[in-house]
């Protein structure tokens, strides 16, 4: 009997956590043959996943036209049973595969119509037009896909009436030693993720400055795409920039910190943050209390788990005061950290999310165009995004 073959098309790094570490490895464990077509240096097989390399496209237009065509041609050589593409840039490849009679899944981890409204490379006046145009394009093309996968309930609303399922961005249960309160003399705040004003970088730097005389340091991990932002980071003495880290490095540093920061700004791309926010769940898994933006979906998770506090992410002074109060209460921090880790073990983990993914594949292979029931949250009803603001703290 032929082993069923899942082929992933991705513009993300070959070792991407959501695609490679979670989805691909889970599929291999279930007995599928798994191939990932990705921009990479060479063909290789890693942990049972066949990686087929493509040359990188440096220009944006090339990524939207040339790269999808190349990936389509490479994909047709794989004889896959399911083709799953992971970025809107590859929609052309997905459409060509559908025209070739293939089963195709569109897997999007972000809500791009909102994200476009914060893209700096698009002139500000054109962003609303670009956002609306993309939303229409995404909606029309979604009729072609055998299934759509999103990372949260908010994004799923855009595909109402389509076979859409939520596969949350829950963490792998990688062995990790939970944070021990009082392990170090210095208090460490930590952030993992992209570094930009919209993601709270400037507020975090201001908080570090305000707490400099309280034996507090801030550690930042992740990509900093703008040189001017990296200069700002290096200008604050009690801030340590650790750059990009692999999963082991991330967990090692999280295990040595005191508080995890998640101060996304109230711009359209982030106000719906919740079950799609991996860093939140990584903090919880490592036993870190969370200091989060007070957005409804984040509050829903954090308050139900009693694993942190939610604050106004634009007010650095009040945030610093709230953080200082937490640092002065080690027993409360220990309790919050334990609560967060227990919530991960009980509900918010990748083994649970992978069961949804497994059912999606079964549906697609059997020709069923129906959604898979989302995993339950700890509250009864999901909530809508918070009101958006164009103001980002400077």
Q: Model regions: which residues?
A:
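Conserved donor-binding/catalytic core segment of Leloir-type glycosyltransferases
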Residues: 7-9, 149, 171, 180-208, ...
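Donor nucleotide-sugar binding/catalytic pocket of nucleotide-sugar-dependent glycosyltransferases
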Residues: 52, 134-178
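Glycosyltransferase donor-sugar binding loop
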Residues: 41-42, 192, 217-230
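Conserved acidic donor-binding segment of nucleotide-sugar-dependent glycosyltransferases
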Residues: 304-305, 309-316, 325-331
């Amino acid at each position: 009997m032929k082993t069923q073959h899942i082929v992933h098309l991705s513009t993300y790094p070959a070792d991407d956590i959501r695609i490679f570490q979670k989805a691909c490895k889970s599929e291999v464990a279930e007995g599928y043959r798994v191939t990932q077509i990705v921009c990479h240096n060479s063909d290789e097989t890693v942990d049972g996943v066949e990686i087929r390399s493509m040359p990188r496209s440096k220009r944006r237009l090339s990524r939207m036209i040339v790269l999808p065509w190349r990936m389509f041609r490479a994909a047709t050589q794989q004889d896959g049973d399911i083709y799953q593409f992971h970025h809107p840039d590859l929609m052309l490849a997905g459409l060509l595969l559908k025209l070739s009679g293939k089963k195709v899944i569109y897997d999007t981890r972000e809500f791009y119509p909102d994200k476009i409204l914060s893209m700096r490379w698009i002139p500000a006046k054109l962003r609303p037009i670009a956002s609306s145009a993309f939303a229409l394009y995404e909606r029309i093309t979604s009729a072609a896909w055998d299934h759509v996968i999103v990372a949260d309930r908010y994004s799923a609303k855009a595909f109402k009436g389509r076979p859409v399922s939520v596969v949350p961005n829950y963490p792998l249960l990688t062995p990790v030693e939970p944070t021990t309160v009082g392990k170090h003399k210095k208090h460490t705040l930590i952030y993992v993720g992209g570094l930009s004003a919209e993601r709270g970088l400037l507020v975090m730097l201001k908080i570090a400055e305000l707490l400099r005389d309280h034996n507090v340091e801030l550690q930042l991990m992740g990509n900093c795409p703008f040189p001017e932002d990296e200069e700002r980071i290096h200008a604050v003495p009690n801030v340590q920039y650790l750059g990009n880290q692999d999963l082991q490095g991330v967990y090692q540093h999280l295990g040595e910190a005191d508080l995890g920061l998640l101060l996304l700004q109230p711009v359209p791309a982030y106000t719906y943050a919740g079950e799609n926010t991996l860093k939140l769940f990584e903090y919880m898994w490592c036993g870190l209390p969370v200091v989060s933006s007070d957005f409804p979906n984040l509050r829903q998770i954090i308050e139900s788990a009693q694993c942190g506090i939610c604050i106004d992410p634009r007010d650095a002074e009040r945030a610093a005061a709230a953080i200082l109060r937490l640092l002065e209460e080690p027993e409360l921090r220990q309790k919050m950290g334990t609560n967060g880790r227990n919530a991960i073990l009980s509900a918010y983990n990748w083994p649970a999310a992978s069961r949804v993914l497994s059912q999606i594949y079964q549906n697609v292979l059997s020709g069923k165009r129906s959604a898979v029931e989302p995993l339950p949250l700890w509250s009864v009803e999901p909530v809508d995004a918070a009101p958006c603001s164009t103001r980002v703290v400077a």
